[in-house]
From Swiss-Prot:
Residues 23-42 bind DNA. SUPFAM superfamilies: Periplasmic binding protein-like II, Winged helix' DNA-binding domain. Changing residue 115 to R: In strain: PAC174. Belongs to the LysR transcriptional regulatory family. It comes from the Bacteria. It comes from Pseudomonas aeruginosa (strain ATCC 15692 / DSM 22644 / CIP 104116 / JCM 14847 / LMG 12228 / 1C / PRS 101 / PAO1). Changing residue 181 to S: In strain: PAC174. Transmembrane segments: none annotated. The gene is trpI. This is HTH-type transcriptional regulator TrpI. Activates the expression of the trpBA genes, which encode the two tryptophan synthase subunits, and represses initiation at its own promoter. Acts by binding to two adjacent sites in the intergenic region. In the absence of the inducer indoleglycerol phosphate (InGP), TrpI binds to site I. In the presence of InGP, TrpI binds to site I and site II. Binding to site II is site I dependent. InGP strongly stimulates binding to site II and is required for maximal activation of trpBA.
């Protein structure tokens, strides 16, 4: 123990007993036993080498040394309470800056943003796009949404939200015109497949899951971002592949179809938070995201 400052637990126990003029009331306030408070006070007296309490007929009585320490502790704890309250207010009032890949932001997050604002009104969410740039440690970010595979780095608090599910999607019109709606997965080896540079392994991984040779795939039009890839699929330009959340609303609205379903990959959609931030809003956001993704 440092000789400069006694145990903070002991000081806290003493301050409560001195302020309330009662060991029992101090124990009740601190949610510990009478004996625990008494032991902490004795440890403090031993450490300081002075008696802090005496006895009178009605309970504990402060000695002169006890009065001095009570006043010092009262001032110190009051200042601490004030600073902590101010820090909590700053956290509550500051926006929570969340990095989201642009495609996920446009196709899944923004359509649910009003629900989020109503569910977590204290979040004060500020969104930042991060297409193609995975850097959860970027200055100014409080958290980032991203698909990635474990293990997770030690300096990040990672909230796993949902497994990544990938699958081919096509416009219903094109599926009917070409017979793709009822075709087996192997039929896609005959189609020029829409693809994106941001997900170069998506088609090969899907082909392997279907027992198909990746080298037999035929690639058609390429796009820089998933968002444009999916717009092309909606327009009937070919078959695309994407994570399920990005096409969930399109499937529900009939703009896209997924005749071959979705496969689960090794990746997870996760909320990445630098461990040093300790912002409780991250946990509340993660829980809301889990519920939405599971729906």
């Amino acid at each position: 123990m440092s000789r400069d400052l006694p145990s903070l637990n002991a000081l806290r126990a003493f301050e409560a007993a001195a302020r309330l003029h009662s060991i029992s009331l101090a124990a009740e306030e601190l949610h510990v036993t009478h004996g625990a408070v008494s032991r902490q006070v004795r440890l403090l007296e031993d450490d300081l080498g002075v008696a802090l309490f005496g006895k009178d007929g009605r309970g504990v009585k402060l000695t002169d040394s006890g009065v001095r320490l009570r006043d010092a502790c009262g001032d110190a704890f009051e200042r601490l309470r004030g600073v902590c309250a101010e820090l909590r207010r700053q956290t509550a009032e500051a926006p929570f800056v969340l990095g989201v890949p642009g495609s996920l932001l446009a196709r899944w997050f923004i359509p649910r943003l009003d629900q989020l604002n109503r569910a977590l009104p204290d979040l004060r969410l500020q969104l930042s796009t991060s297409e193609g740039e995975f850097d959860p440690r970027r200055p100014g970010l409080d958290a980032m949404l991203w698909f990635a595979e474990p293990p997770w780095p030690a300096d990040m608090q990672v909230f796993e939200l949902a497994p990544e599910r990938m699958g081919p999607v096509v416009s219903p019109r094109l599926a009917q015109e070409t017979g793709l709606a009822q075709a087996p997965a192997a039929r896609l080896l005959q189609e020029p497949l829409l693809h994106t540079a941001s997900r170069p392994q998506a088609w090969p991984a899907w082909a392997a899951s279907q027992g198909l040779a990746a080298e037999a795939l035929r690639y058609g039009q390429g796009f820089e971002h998933l968002y444009y890839l999916l717009e092309a699929a909606v327009a009937g330009l070919g078959v695309a592949i994407a994570p399920e959340p990005l096409v969930r609303d399109d499937l529900a609205a009939g703009r896209l179809a997924a005749p071959w379903g979705f496969i689960e990959t090794d990746a997870r959609l996760a909320l990445w938070v630098p461990a040093r931030l300790h912002d409780p809003r991250a946990g509340r956001l993660a829980q809301w995201l889990r519920e939405q993704l599971a729906g």
